[in-house]
Amino acid sequence: MPENIIAGIPVHFPFEPYEVQRAYMEKVIMCLRDGTNGVLESPTGTGKTLSLLCASLAWIRTRQSEQQQYMQKLQLDQQKQATGGAGAGVADLNAVMGKANNWGVPKVIYASRTHSQLSQAMRELKRTAYANMKSVVLGSRDQLCIHPDVMREQGNSNKVNMCKLKVHAKTCSFQLRVESKKDHPDFRGPSIMDIEDLVKVGQRLKMCPYFASKELVNGADITFMPYNYLLDPKARKANKIELSNTIVILDEAHNIEKICEESASVQIRSSDVAMAIEDITHIMKIFTSGDAQDTGGPEEPKDFTLDDLTLLKEMLLELEKAIDGVVVDNKAEGTTYPAAHIYELLGKANFTYGNCATIVALLDKLVQYLMVASQHSTMLRKGGSFMVLADLLNIVFANKEDVMSKVHRSFKVHVEIEDNKQSKNAANSAKPQTGWLGKGNNAASSVTKAAKIINFWCFNPGFGMEQLLNAHVRSVILTSGTLAPLKPLIAELAIPVAQHLENPHIVDRSQVYVKIIGTGPDREQLISNYKNRDNPKYISSLGQTILNVSRIVPDGLLVFFPSYPMLNQCVDAWQASGLWADISCRKPIFLEPRGKDQFTSTMEEFYQAIRDSKGACFMAVCRGKVSEGLDFADRNGRAVIITGLPFPPLKDPKVVLKRRYLETNRTKENQLLSGQEWYNLDATRAVNQAIGRVIRHRNDYGAILLCDARFQDMSQVQQLSKWIRGHLGARPQSSPFGPIVRELRQFFKHAEQTMAQPEERVVEPLLQTVCKEEQPTLACASSSQITIKREPGTGGTKFQLASELAAQAEMANTIKTWTPADYANAAGSSTLGRRAPDAMDFMSRLNANVTSIDFNSADAGQDLVKIHKRERSSPTASESSMIAKKRYKLIGNGPLKTEPSEPATTSSSFCPTPAQSQLKEAPESRADFLREVRSVIDCDQFRSFGKALLAYKTGGDGCFETLMVLLLDVLGAPQLRYLLLGMRRYLKNEHKLEFDVRLASFQAT
């Protein structure tokens, strides 16, 4: 690889670096050389991660070489002075050793927000000349553990405790093999191992990947880990992370302030305390009944005594009493107290700095005890309430008494009323069905009273960064594509910063089209503020804008909304008006789901749909998963539409207190933002992050459309990334919609003619699903292998398998209700990620796991489509290939094209004959039933059918009459009677008898 001298250090880069990459690497090396901190912004697509890794590891390698040469020189000098006497030699050796310890080569800790981002960084490292340097990634037990008993546990905390239990009892064979297998060539090989590689090697060697990875840390030049391992003191201690003389790199640091604040904040509920009291009471009953189970060997002393339990229960009862006594003046919004209130509250129950460590140790032992006991009884919880209490004590008493004045300025206690249903659910979710307590027990009353939530919130992110500096790190480098403006970030983190950088983008101006769209095609102002967001004219105009843009933008179109409620509101309105169908005629629409399982399959479907000539449209939310670090390079994202500014909820207690904290602590010296400036910046940073989904590399191109008139405000523009500001000019103004359409069309025409079109790309899997030997039916699926429509039981990702099992359960012969999700599925949405929707919520599109909604049609004037199965490509194809190739073909509502050998008419191609109908039964699945209805009636009839169902679900008895008339009209033909009969199961109970009478009368005629 080419060698470049940057800041005096030879750096091997995979290619000749661009100027922005040189500038970036120079800043990194200067930080490492001088032992200073840096805040570096470089837009997504400029090779930031590659530059960061190459620069830091080049400096490390140079230091290693220099130290090796220095030590060799000292050894030669000592040999020459060997005749000078033993005393002199010992003195020289001591001096050399002392200097060497102080001069040791630093190690790199590379931290990012998610494991997928860490995996991406490790893939970048494999491309470099530094791929042979020692590296390791730290992951959770949830990702690395291969013990079947641990993996069966639900929730990360239960897995952690089960693992600790087995290790303590020496019953985990995988962990016991670590010592004998840790030097195996497969494990110590030169290749870089990410999470999946560690799991595969662990399975092959029958060795625990979680504990084995820790064996590599001491010898590693660079260690990859998520933020919480670094910033959470408890996680740092558990993973034995040494920070002294290390280089800490925080990549994707645009949310670092919030992460620091959250790592120092904690919450406890009245129901948590009540459950902890119940758990202790039950353990005491076991002890007094003589059934106690000792987790240790027969000769080991008990980990705790009955006296320990009695004392802890008394303390918890006092804590419960103290929480009950807290006054909440404003029951709607809660009441705020100074930070000292949490210490007073805990002090009433005798929780203090002096006994905190002892109590936390006892709580850990109780969790271990319950983990053992719960293996023998399903009546027991697993100590979740003890873990909540331990977290509270660890965080509250982590701040030393000598910094209490700073704690009082930076923390607040906010007390809310715990929703009665919520507290009961919390108590009942893990509570044994027969109950543990007698009627007179004091603990039971806490849930039925006005239960409370005690929040201990940190508003000073400098606390987290101060911990790193106090651990004597060499350098801290914060970097991201969206850090601007840098000054307020540096001020909030309160760390000395010697190097800062705001890089321009790597692409030419002609590759990016940026415009503010202040009005829609109908000249209605586009402004998504609180007053206007419910305006039907605004919502319609926004939909018309997206429709017009979708006609021009090739391939992938991303649309970001300020919030989920706003996305829901627009979807509902556009579906009612027909705009949704019009947009989906141009591009199939995908919605960002909230669940993890559905998210992966949805993204894979979207990437697959991009290969179609129409492309696809993805509607997502700022600050959601799609806006954070996903790859929409090239065809996957040719344009991004920002529909509004995602301001945080103005009256949210945490937002109110954050603004108040800034106003109170702001001075000319510390340069903190005002509360309003912070509020505006929080929204703009989310916009910057969403914009960064497009333009992912040097040869990429795309459009950025800011569809909110407020983007014209200079105060808002100044907070956008520097490279975006360059495209908007000194005085940004919105342009009329007509000229924008012409310019946008010309932009893409010119780009397609002048830019090299990308080759077909294989998108990396979004969430790496680790293949476990214990689960042979779960196969890892990359996007290059994904099959959009599959038969149940044919393999695929564990998310897909879970979805199929849910779908199979849904097909049980029970009375079910209709939801709009079913209506959408009938019109072509994916079956992946489907679950039984809320029976009472007719408008729960986004709460249901609908992964994609595609009302695609060949005719822009038609709203819906017919769905047919594609024929097998070959009669001799194998069974597996037939399954893999199975798709639903989306076609228009016009005449169907037929094979030459078929009759010319098409009516019989989708309407069964009377003879056929005698043999047919209506599909059990709602979605399949709707698809069949859709395939046998025309577009207008199906639209009326859907509206009648919606009206019936939400309306009164009169709506049944309307529905009945329509059913007899559209499904009354003899060959469709099986569908008419099938409708009975979806009716309300009070209408079924009348349905039977009407149907009998209809058949008689």
Swiss-Prot record:
Disulfide bonds: none annotated. It comes from the Eukaryota. InterPro entries: ATP-dep_Helicase_C, DinG/Rad3-like, Helic_SF1/SF2_ATP-bd_DinG/Rad3, Helicase-like_DEXD_c2, HHD_RTEL1, P-loop_NTPase, RAD3-like_helicase_DEAD, Rad3/Chl1-like. One of its GO terms (biological process) is negative regulation of DNA recombination. [4Fe-4S] cluster binds at C145, C163, C172, C208. Residues 893-917 are annotated as: Disordered. Residues 7-322 form the Helicase ATP-binding domain. Gene3D superfamilies: 1.20.1160.20, P-loop containing nucleotide triphosphate hydrolases (3.40.50.300). It catalyses: ATP + H2O = ADP + phosphate + H(+). ATP binds at S42, P43, T44, G45, T46, G47, K48, T49. SMART domains: DEXDc2 (SM00488), HELICc2 (SM00491). Pfam families: ARCH_RTEL1, DEAD_2, Helicase_C_2. The keyword Manganese does not apply. A motif (DEAH box) lies at residues 251-254. Keywords: 4Fe-4S, ATP-binding, DNA damage, DNA repair, DNA-binding, Helicase, Hydrolase, Iron, Iron-sulfur, Isomerase, Metal-binding, Nucleotide-binding, Nucleus, Phosphoprotein. Its main location: nucleus. The modification Phosphothreonine is found at T876. A probable ATP-dependent DNA helicase implicated in DNA repair and the maintenance of genomic stability. Acts as an anti-recombinase to counteract toxic recombination and limit crossover during meiosis. Regulates meiotic recombination and crossover homeostasis by physically dissociating strand invasion events and thereby promotes noncrossover repair by meiotic synthesis dependent strand annealing (SDSA) as well as disassembly of D loop recombination intermediates. NCBIfam families: rad3 (TIGR00604). This is Regulator of telomere elongation helicase 1 homolog.
